[in-house]
Amino acid sequence: MMIEIIPKISIPKNGLGSFTRPCRRIEFSYCNWGGSSKGMKEFLSTKLESLAKESQDVEFHVTNRQGKHPLIRAYYNTGREKVICTRKMSASSIFQKAILCRDSDGLKPRLIKYPVESTNPSVRGIWSPFSDQAKPHEIYKKKSP
């Protein structure tokens, strides 16, 4: 009896076939008059275009706020927003902060108590050689005759 192999391509049926970035919009604000916006103005004139070409699924807005320090404000699909003050930062560090905003998920930082998360935690806990204190190990020495 011979088995025939039918060549097929697996097609995702649950909607997981595409990746959507959690960050949907990034807003850059600066002031024309203030000296704290010098790095932001340099970033907007040199590096913003390359960042926008890299991430075409994110919407970029540039606003002028007179008398205010420059900000990066990121809006996420979860409804949260992250605000980073870029006062007196260089253009390269503002670029790194913009990439950080673009790549983060927008969730609140949370404390991870255990390195492994499980849906069914162990009844006895995780075994460790130091946890068995009831029976300490003994070192046996050979007695010489």
Curated annotation (Swiss-Prot):
Keywords: Mitochondrion, Ribonucleoprotein, Ribosomal protein. InterPro entries: Ribosomal_mL43, Ribosomal_mL43/mS25/NADH_DH, Thioredoxin-like_sf. GO terms for cellular component: mitochondrial large ribosomal subunit; mitochondrion. Pfam families: L51_S25_CI-B8. SMART domains: L51_S25_CI-B8. Gene3D superfamilies: Glutaredoxin (3.40.30.10). One of its GO terms (molecular function) is structural constituent of ribosome. It is found in: Mitochondrion. One of its GO terms (biological process) is mitochondrial translation. The keyword Ribosomal protein applies. Transmembrane segments: none annotated. The keyword Cytoplasm does not apply. Component of the mitochondrial large ribosomal subunit (mt-LSU). Mature yeast 74S mitochondrial ribosomes consist of a small (37S) and a large (54S) subunit. The 37S small subunit contains a 15S ribosomal RNA (15S mt-rRNA) and at least 32 different proteins. The 54S large subunit contains a 21S rRNA (21S mt-rRNA) and at least 45 different proteins. Belongs to the mitochondrion-specific ribosomal protein mL43 family. Component of the mitochondrial ribosome (mitoribosome), a dedicated translation machinery responsible for the synthesis of mitochondrial genome-encoded proteins, including at least some of the essential transmembrane subunits of the mitochondrial respiratory chain. The mitoribosomes are attached to the mitochondrial inner membrane and translation products are cotranslationally integrated into the membrane. Also has an extraribosomal function, being essential for mitochondrial genome integrity. May interact with MHR1 to take part in the mtDNA repair mechanism. This is Large ribosomal subunit protein mL43. It comes from Schizosaccharomyces pombe (strain 972 / ATCC 24843). The lineage of its organism: Eukaryota, Fungi, Dikarya, Ascomycota, Taphrinomycotina.
